[in-house]
Amino acid sequence: ALNSDEKVVLQKLVQSFRQSEKLQQHVEFLYAKGSVYHIENGNLLYHGAVPMTKKGTFAVERFEGHAYSGRALMDYCDERARRGYFAPEGSAARQSGQDFLWYLWCGKLSPLYGRSAMTTFERLYVEDASTHTEVKDPYYTWYNEEAVCRRILAEFGLPGTSHIVNGHVPVQELSLIHI
C-alpha cells in the first residue's frame, strides 16, 4: 500500500501524463501508424521477438481462455493494446487493455520484450548481481538459423525469400584487445 506522500506523487504523475498534449499526440501517432509487426514489400518488420521455446518452436501463451503463438500472439497483443486506447473511457475493456500494456512492457512471452524478467530496479538499487538476471527468450538463440527464419516468414504468409527486419536485437558488449 502507498503512503499519503506516495499517493500524491502518483496522482501528479498520472495527471501529467493524461494532460500532456504533446504526449497524447505522440501516442495517437503510434496507434495510427504503428503495430506490433508490419509487412511491407515482402519484408516482415517487428521490434522485439517472436517468442519461442528452447526447441525453436513458437511459444504458446494463454489469454482469456485461448492459446496464442507466432502471428496469432502478435495479433492478439496488438488488439489488446488498441483496446486499452480506443475502448470507451471508464469501460472494463479499456482498463483491461491498459493493464495489458504492462505485460507488453515486461511480460515473459511478450513479443515486445523478449526476456524472462525486468530487473531495472534491481540493477539500480540492489548490489547482489544475482538479482539482475534477465534471461533472453530462446528466440535470440534461434533467430540466425535459416530454417527458423523461414518458419517465421511462413507463419506470416511470406515466402522464404522475404526478409525479417528485427528492430530490437540486444547489443552485446565486446571486449576489445589492443595490441
Question: Where are the language model's segments positioned?
Answer:
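Feature recognizes metal-dependent phosphohydrolase scaffolds
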Residues: 1-178
